[in-house]
Amino acid sequence: NGNIDIDFGRIEPKNPLLISLKLFISKTVTPDDIEKYVNTFQEILIKTLTRSDYANDCSIATTKKQEICQKCKIDMLILSLTKDGNHHQTYSSIDYILPYYKKLEELVDKKLVKNIGVSDVSDISMLEKLQEQTKIPPAAIQVKYVSSMRCDSQILDLIQFGEKHDVLMLRHSDEVPFLTREQLNSNVCKGCEKGCHICRIDNVDAVLKYSITSKWHSVLLGKGYF
């Protein structure tokens, strides 16, 4: 619902904030919706950083907002599409992925995002097609090894693919599938008191998982969801 409270602590003014996003979307989300979710996150982030001392002075707030826009860089956006009808995180064809991926390319063209990637696409032939049929190939491919790898040879194939195409291979530990109500509430409610029902989610179309770092420094916000 957009209610996020982020405490960034003290940030050196010359160090840009590097943001990594992973967007989980269900089949109800269209490719055109992707930019909306990214813009919403940036708006919430900027509002969080420009509140308090700047709230009563529009000119100062505007200046601060421009500074923050320059410092807050979405360094990586990874797309995770919904599971198929067999309850596996797989993709039946490149034709299903491409419309969504092309929207990621538009975000790069608009300089809203620096790098883009996909999650849980471990079929080498499909990754080759993604390389051939896109203007901006994936900078990263994220895989959950335990659930996605059929054998050691598949891991080696992915590593070799990454080396050949200069693609960063990343490992994740997210629940697969992530957008089921039970799995999502389990992640969102971690740390809540037992019996808490305030943050329970009944219906969801998309979830953004984010991490924020200060360049040359440490992780400011390791992981969060909205």
Regions found by a protein language model. Name each.
Residues 1-54, 72, 90, 95, ...:
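N-terminal binding-site loop/beta-alpha segment at the start of enzyme catalytic domains
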Residues 1-14, 32, 36, 46-67, ...:
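Eukaryotic N-terminal low-complexity, Ser/Thr- and Lys/Arg-rich leader segments
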Residues 19-20, 65, 162:
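Generic low-polarity alpha-helical segments
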Residues 67-89:
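Active-site groove signature of glycoside hydrolases
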